[in-house]
C-alpha cells in the first residue's frame, strides 16, 4: 500500500488467489476483444488495444487467450459477444460513494448481480447521477522512480498536457485529461522513461475518511461486486490515513 493518496478513489486490488486470478484473466481478455472491435485488430494502429494487450501480458494471461480475443474482436475469428458498457452508482456503508463499471452481454444479469452485492453488504443502488457528479475521469500514468526525480518527470510531460506529478513512494503518478493520455505516454517514451502503468481512472472531488472497520466493510462490498464477471472496475471515494493503512496491513 503506497499511502492514502493512492487509496482515495482508485480501484481496489484483488487478492491473487486462483479464483480471483481466473476472473481477472476473463476481464482482461474481454477488454482486448472490445478494444479490437472498437478500433481494429492492429495494436500498432489502436493504442487502446495495445494497452490492453500489455496489461494482459503483465498479468500473465496466456498469449493464446490474448490472440484469440484480438481475433474475435476484429472479426478475424467467429464467436465474439456483444459487450455493452454500463455504469451503476450508489452508496456503500458510511455514506461512501460507489461507481461500478460493467461490461456485459446480459443487462438483466449484470443489474441483478450488482444489486444483490450492494444490498447484502450495506449498500444501495442509486439513480443515474446520484454520485457520479463527485467523480472526474482522469488520465493516470505511473512510472517507476529508479534514479528519476520529480522534476525529471515533470519536464518530460509538461508540454504534453500533464497536470500533476505525485510522489507515491515507489512510483511517480502523472495525472492528465484522458484525451491527453496518449500524448503524455509518448512524451515519456521520447524521454526514455519506462511506463509502469497507464489508464483512465475516476477520482473523487469529495472524500470520506474511514477508520479500519469502516474500510473493511467497504472492501467486503468491493470484493462482492468484483465477484461478478460483468463488473470490470469499482471506484469509491474513501480516504485512509497512514494509521488506518498500517492497521489494515495486519489483517490476513
UniProtKB/Swiss-Prot annotation:
Coiled coil spans: none
Alphabetical keyword list: Cytoplasm, DNA-binding, Transcription, Transcription regulation
Biological process terms in GO annotation: regulation of DNA-templated transcription
Molecular function GO labels: DNA binding
Residue span of region Disordered: 1-22
Localization in the cell: Cytoplasm
SUPFAM superfamilies given in the database record: YebC-like
Keyword Iron-sulfur: no
Disulfide bonds: none
GO cellular component: cytosol
Family the UniProt entry places it in: Belongs to the TACO1 family.
PANTHER family referenced in this protein's UniProt entry, alphabetically: TRANSCRIPTIONAL REGULATORY PROTEIN YEBC-RELATED, TRANSLATIONAL ACTIVATOR OF CYTOCHROME C OXIDASE 1
Protein name: Probable transcriptional regulatory protein CE1776
Lineage: Bacteria, Bacillati, Actinomycetota, Actinomycetes, Mycobacteriales
Amino acid at each position: 500500500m503506497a499511502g492514502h493518496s493512492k487509496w482515495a478513489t482508485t480501484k481496489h486490488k484483488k487478492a491473487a488467489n486462483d479464483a480471483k486470478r481466473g476472473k481477472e484473466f476473463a476481464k482482461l481478455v474481454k477488454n482486448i476483444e472490445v478494444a479490437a472491435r472498437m478500433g481494429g485488430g492492429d495494436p500498432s494502429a489502436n493504442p487502446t488495444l495495445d494497452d490492453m494487450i500489455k496489461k494482459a501480458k503483465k498479468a500473465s494471461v496466456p498469449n493464446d487467450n490474448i490472440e484469440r480475443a484480438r481475433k474475435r474482436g476484429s472479426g478475424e475469428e467467429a464467436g465474439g459477444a456483444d459487450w455493452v458498457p454500463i455504469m451503476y452508482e450508489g452508496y456503500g456503508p458510511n455514506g461512501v460513494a460507489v461507481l461500478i463499471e460493467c461490461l456485459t452481454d446480459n443487462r438483466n444479469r449484470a443489474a441483478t448481480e450488482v444489486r444483490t452485492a450492494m444490498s447484502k453488504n450495506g449498500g444501495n443502488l442509486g439513480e443515474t447521477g446520484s454520485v457520479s457528479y463527485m467523480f472526474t475521469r482522469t488520465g493516470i500514468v505511473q512510472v517507476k522512480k529508479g534514479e528519476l526525480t520529480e522534476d525529471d518527470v515533470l519536464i518530460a510531460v509538461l508540454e504534453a498536457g500533464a497536470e500533476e506529478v505525485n510522489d507515491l513512494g515507489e512510483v511517480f503518478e502523472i495525472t492528465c485529461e484522458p484525451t491527453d493520455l496518449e500524448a503524455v505516454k509518448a512524451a515519456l517514451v521520447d524521454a526514455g522513461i519506462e511506463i509502469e502503468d497507464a489508464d483512465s481512472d475516476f477520482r473523487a472531488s469529495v472524500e470520506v475518511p474511514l477508520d479500519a472497520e469502516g474500510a473493511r466493510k467497504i472492501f467486503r462490498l468491493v470484493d462482492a461486486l468484483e465477484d461478478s464477471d460483468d463488473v470490470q472496475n469499482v471506484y469509491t471515494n474513501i480516504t485512509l490515513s497512514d494509521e488506518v493503512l498500517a492497521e489494515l496491513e495486519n489483517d490476513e
